[in-house]
């Protein structure tokens, strides 16, 4: 079996986790108490959904997941929520005091007290797997638990499970909407370790997803629940082929192979289509070509950056529902002829497609319409550099005056770590610039030295 262990860190990670497991349970017909009436064989471990759920002797399905936070309030919502019986109490780990938006608290002082307990729980989950294929990590880098404890945990996972792939779903700070003053510091420090310790990172940003909810679903004032449900559709589409059978199945390690041209260039954009409200869907059924085009629309991107400003290196299209390979090939051929969608010249094919026959499931009472077919796109584009340069700029403005730095140093960090992380990101921006440049002007020499 190819099991995946999910790790949800900090408030963002946990709330995305809630939406995600709610959706998975609906997709597989698992009740909130973990029972699955449709699953006749008790303890049968060969079903496709066992990649994400383990089955107990009593026929209860338990997510292979750990939720962790440094303060209890958010996890207490899981402990008392609808799905409280789904999780084993040991999977919900909470500390006593907050990381207080401080990377250093999450990474050094408070994080290091809890990290061994987390690794212990993860080890238990891993021992329960027959063929662990990797970890999915959900966190935000603007706060402190997601950034500090998230980085610490990823570093430790690299040591303990060196060869297993790690996929991150990372909420980055948005250009306009800010939740804390020190976001730029936390993000830069955290990205510094994401660069080294994740294999693929999917960037999400709240503002972009707000706009999608407002524009496509006509929700005037989207809540986090609206956002998280949209994000969990994306994550569900990504993992659908691990959980259901289809024509073209895609493994987690396959994302890495197909999307990451150089180890550092692994920050992905994602988009999902069709995002339409129930009222509209009643009147229109979208074809494969239409949803494919809409997945490439800059407005569909779940991070605030414009793919027209960069070039695509690779892109992965995951279709689900009523889709046949012939339609997919036609849609992809059309995309390739469009001048607005440009690929780097050293990657001529650039597309990986997956098809899964399970149509998208929607949460009852949710905002998304039930549709026959949907597509989720994960793409590696040089325009992602915009996200980093925006954060770097804000970092520089604050760091020039050393504003707020004493809070980090007081928690046992050294000032040198700031400049080291910032230099690493400067190098990353440069890497993206070089990758997007036209090849052939003697750049091959430089690249050989760099990687």
Swiss-Prot record:
<dbReference type="Pfam" id="PF00091">
    <property type="entry name" value="Tubulin"/>
</dbReference>
<keyword id="KW-0479">Metal-binding</keyword>
<comment type="function">
    <text>Tubulin is the major constituent of microtubules, a cylinder consisting of laterally associated linear protofilaments composed of alpha- and beta-tubulin heterodimers. Microtubules grow by the addition of GTP-tubulin dimers to the microtubule end, where a stabilizing cap forms. Below the cap, tubulin dimers are in GDP-bound state, owing to GTPase activity of alpha-tubulin.</text>
</comment>
<dbReference type="InterPro" id="IPR018316">
    <property type="entry name" value="Tubulin/FtsZ_2-layer-sand-dom"/>
</dbReference>
<dbReference type="InterPro" id="IPR037103">
    <property type="entry name" value="Tubulin/FtsZ-like_C"/>
</dbReference>
<keyword id="KW-0206">Cytoskeleton</keyword>
<keyword id="KW-0493">Microtubule</keyword>
<dbReference type="GO" id="GO:0005525">
    <property type="term" value="F:GTP binding"/>
</dbReference>
<feature type="site" description="Involved in polymerization">
    <location>
        <position position="451"/>
    </location>
</feature>
<dbReference type="InterPro" id="IPR003008">
    <property type="entry name" value="Tubulin_FtsZ_GTPase"/>
</dbReference>
<dbReference type="InterPro" id="IPR023123">
    <property type="entry name" value="Tubulin_C"/>
</dbReference>
<dbReference type="InterPro" id="IPR002452">
    <property type="entry name" value="Alpha_tubulin"/>
</dbReference>
<comment type="similarity">
    <text>Belongs to the tubulin family.</text>
</comment>
<feature type="binding site">
    <location>
        <position position="11"/>
    </location>
    <ligand>
        <name>GTP</name>
    </ligand>
</feature>
<dbReference type="GO" id="GO:0007017">
    <property type="term" value="P:microtubule-based process"/>
</dbReference>
<dbReference type="Pfam" id="PF03953">
    <property type="entry name" value="Tubulin_C"/>
</dbReference>
<keyword id="KW-0460">Magnesium</keyword>
<dbReference type="GO" id="GO:0005874">
    <property type="term" value="C:microtubule"/>
</dbReference>
<feature type="binding site">
    <location>
        <position position="71"/>
    </location>
    <ligand>
        <name>GTP</name>
    </ligand>
</feature>
<dbReference type="InterPro" id="IPR036525">
    <property type="entry name" value="Tubulin/FtsZ_GTPase_sf"/>
</dbReference>
<dbReference type="InterPro" id="IPR000217">
    <property type="entry name" value="Tubulin"/>
</dbReference>
<comment type="subunit">
    <text>Dimer of alpha and beta chains. A typical microtubule is a hollow water-filled tube with an outer diameter of 25 nm and an inner diameter of 15 nM. Alpha-beta heterodimers associate head-to-tail to form protofilaments running lengthwise along the microtubule wall with the beta-tubulin subunit facing the microtubule plus end conferring a structural polarity. Microtubules usually have 13 protofilaments but different protofilament numbers can be found in some organisms and specialized cells.</text>
</comment>
<feature type="active site">
    <location>
        <position position="254"/>
    </location>
</feature>
<dbReference type="GO" id="GO:0005737">
    <property type="term" value="C:cytoplasm"/>
</dbReference>
<keyword id="KW-0342">GTP-binding</keyword>
<dbReference type="GO" id="GO:0046872">
    <property type="term" value="F:metal ion binding"/>
</dbReference>
<dbReference type="GO" id="GO:0016787">
    <property type="term" value="F:hydrolase activity"/>
</dbReference>
<keyword id="KW-0007">Acetylation</keyword>
<feature type="binding site">
    <location>
        <position position="206"/>
    </location>
    <ligand>
        <name>GTP</name>
    </ligand>
</feature>
<dbReference type="GO" id="GO:0005200">
    <property type="term" value="F:structural constituent of cytoskeleton"/>
</dbReference>
<feature type="compositionally biased region" description="Acidic residues">
    <location>
        <begin position="431"/>
        <end position="451"/>
    </location>
</feature>
<feature type="binding site">
    <location>
        <position position="145"/>
    </location>
    <ligand>
        <name>GTP</name>
    </ligand>
</feature>
<feature type="binding site">
    <location>
        <position position="71"/>
    </location>
    <ligand>
        <name>Mg(2+)</name>
    </ligand>
</feature>
<feature type="binding site">
    <location>
        <position position="228"/>
    </location>
    <ligand>
        <name>GTP</name>
    </ligand>
</feature>
<feature type="region of interest" description="Disordered">
    <location>
        <begin position="429"/>
        <end position="451"/>
    </location>
</feature>
<dbReference type="InterPro" id="IPR008280">
    <property type="entry name" value="Tub_FtsZ_C"/>
</dbReference>
<keyword id="KW-0378">Hydrolase</keyword>
<keyword id="KW-0547">Nucleotide-binding</keyword>
<feature type="binding site">
    <location>
        <position position="179"/>
    </location>
    <ligand>
        <name>GTP</name>
    </ligand>
</feature>
<feature type="modified residue" description="N6-acetyllysine">
    <location>
        <position position="40"/>
    </location>
</feature>
<protein>
    <recommendedName>
        <fullName>Tubulin alpha-1 chain</fullName>
        <ecNumber>3.6.5.-</ecNumber>
    </recommendedName>
</protein>
<keyword id="KW-0963">Cytoplasm</keyword>
């Amino acid at each position: 079996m190819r099991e995946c262990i999910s790790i949800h860190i900090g408030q963002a990670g946990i709330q995305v986790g809630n939406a995600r497991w709610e959706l998975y349970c609906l997709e597989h017909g698992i009740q909130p108490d973990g029972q699955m009436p449709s699953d006749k064989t008790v303890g049968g471990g060969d079903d496709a959904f066992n990649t994400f759920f383990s089955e107990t002797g009593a026929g209860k399905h338990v997510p292979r997941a750990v939720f962790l936070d440094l303060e209890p309030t958010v996890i207490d919502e899981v402990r008392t929520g609808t799905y409280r019986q789904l999780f084993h109490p040991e999977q919900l780990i909470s500390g006593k005091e907050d990381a207080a938006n401080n990377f250093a608290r999450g990474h050094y002082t408070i994080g290091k007290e809890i990290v061994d307990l987390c690794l212990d729980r993860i080890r238990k989950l891993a021992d329960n797997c027959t063929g662990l294929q990797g970890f999915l990590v959900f966190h935000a880098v603007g706060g402190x638990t997601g950034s500090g404890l998230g980085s610490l945990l990823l570093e430790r996972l690299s040591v303990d499970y060196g060869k297993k792939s790690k996929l991150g779903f990372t909420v980055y700070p948005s250009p306009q909407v800010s939740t804390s003053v020190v976001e730029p510091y936390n993000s830069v420090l955290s990205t510094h370790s994401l660069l080294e310790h994740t294999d693929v990172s999917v960037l999400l940003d709240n503002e972009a997803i707000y706009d999608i909810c407002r524009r496509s679903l006509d929700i005037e004032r989207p809540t986090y629940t609206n956002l998280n449900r949209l994000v969990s559709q994306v994550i569900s589409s990504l993992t659908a082929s691990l959980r259901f059978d289809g024509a073209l199945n895609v493994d987690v390690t396959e994302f890495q192979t197909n999307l990451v041209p150089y180890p550092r260039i692994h920050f992905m954009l994602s988009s999902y289509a069709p995002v339409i409200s129930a009222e509209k869907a009643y009147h229109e059924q979208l074809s494969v070509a239409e949803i494919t085009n809409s997945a490439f629309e800059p407005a569909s991107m779940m991070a605030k950056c414009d793919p027209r400003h960069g070039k695509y290196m690779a892109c992965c299209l995951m279709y689900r529902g009523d889709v046949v390979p012939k339609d997919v090939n036609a849609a992809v051929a059309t995309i390739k002829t469009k001048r607005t969608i440009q690929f780097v010249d050293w990657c001529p094919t650039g597309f990986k497609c997956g098809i899964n026959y399970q149509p998208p499931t929607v949460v009852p009472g949710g905002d998304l319409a039930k549709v026959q077919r949907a597509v989720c796109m994960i793409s590696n584009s040089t325009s992602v550099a915009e996200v980093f340069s925006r954060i770097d700029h804000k970092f520089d403005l604050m760091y020039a005056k050393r504003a707020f730095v004493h809070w980090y140093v007081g928690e046992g960090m050294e000032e040198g770590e700031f400049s080291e992380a910032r230099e690493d990101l400067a190098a990353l921006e440069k890497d993206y610039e070089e990758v997007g440049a036209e090849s052939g002007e003697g750049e091959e020499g430089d690249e050989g030295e760099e990687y």
